Amino acid sequence: VRIENSFIPVQGVGEATEQKLWSNGITHWDEFDGSVVGPTRADRIETFIADAWPHLDDGDASFFDRNLPSGERWRLYENFRPETCFFDIETTGLDHHRDRVTTVSFHRDGETTTLVQGEDLTADTLARQFEDAKLLVTFNGKRFDVPFLETSFGVDLDMPHVDLMYPCKQLGYSGGLKSIEGELGVERDEPDITGKDAVRLWREYERGDESALDTLVSYNRDDAVNLQSLMETVQDKLHQDVFETAREQ
């Protein structure tokens, strides 16, 4: 589902109305026919479409983020795929006021970068990684990764954000990232380690074991890279469930 297939950002248009439009063959803004929904709702939709096209042409993801229901932000991905930043952090614990961020890995446009505490992980290097990103993708990042980075480094991550934990729940998948990857058939290059292992590896690195850092970084990079595979799998499943099912009715 692309943004221009979506009518749900319009105030007063819910799932039922959007699916009614789709099932009547109106699957794109350019195909809109107000007779399917009645004059009042048709006026709202036509006004929204006229307003929305310039925002889409300008690559303004924030406009659609503000108008989409929170559970539908996954629809942003197809339009903003090249400017999507997948990222994951490792820390010394769970308290973003007391514990430290140890590594942060970013996956953008096929390239993966890792920043390490004490080497190149600073507020400036973080800001550069997020620069020009139109969409963030994480797993449990709204409750964990984002608060940690904002508290620890003072970076502003107030931008469109798909936290994959929520669309996974929408599809009936619960649990942690690794268990959901397993259920969906998303494979990893490296053996799986736990969050506790990540803390232990950092402690070993601080005591002088460079190989422990190599293992931690490899694990962290896998997390970031696999977020793209998970995003695309989730998007495909939701596209089928939400869009194709309605079109077939």
Residue locations for each model-derived region?
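Active-site catalytic pocket residues across diverse enzymes, especially alpha/beta-hydrolases
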Residues: G25, F153, V234
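Short amphipathic alpha-helical segments
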Residues: R98-D99, L149-T151, E232
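N-terminal accessory regions of nucleic-acid-interacting proteins
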Residues: V1-R81
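Conserved DEDDh/DEDDy metal-dependent 3′-5′ exonuclease domain
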Residues: T103-F106, T112-E190
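Conserved RNase H-like, two-metal-ion catalytic cores of nucleic-acid enzymes
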Residues: R66-L135
